[in-house]
């Protein structure tokens, strides 16, 4: 999980979601692409 000031999709499998008021990126193809804003 990367914590970044700005989260962007890294590939076509990345999805931007909002959990508990935090913007996150989840990726089914590559788990390294997981990101959280903060």
Swiss-Prot record:
Single biological process term from Gene Ontology: translation
Xref: InterPro entries: Ribosomal_bL36, Ribosomal_bL36_sp
Pfam families associated with the record: Ribosomal_L36
GO molecular function annotation: structural constituent of ribosome
Keyword Ribonucleoprotein in annotation: yes
Coiled-coil ranges from the UniProt annotation: none
Family, per entry: Belongs to the bacterial ribosomal protein bL36 family.
Primary gene name: rpmJ
GO CC annotations on file: cytoplasm; ribonucleoprotein complex; ribosome
Protein name (database record): Large ribosomal subunit protein bL36
PANTHER family (UniProt xref): 50S RIBOSOMAL PROTEIN L36, CHLOROPLASTIC, LARGE RIBOSOMAL SUBUNIT PROTEIN BL36C
Protein keywords: Ribonucleoprotein, Ribosomal protein
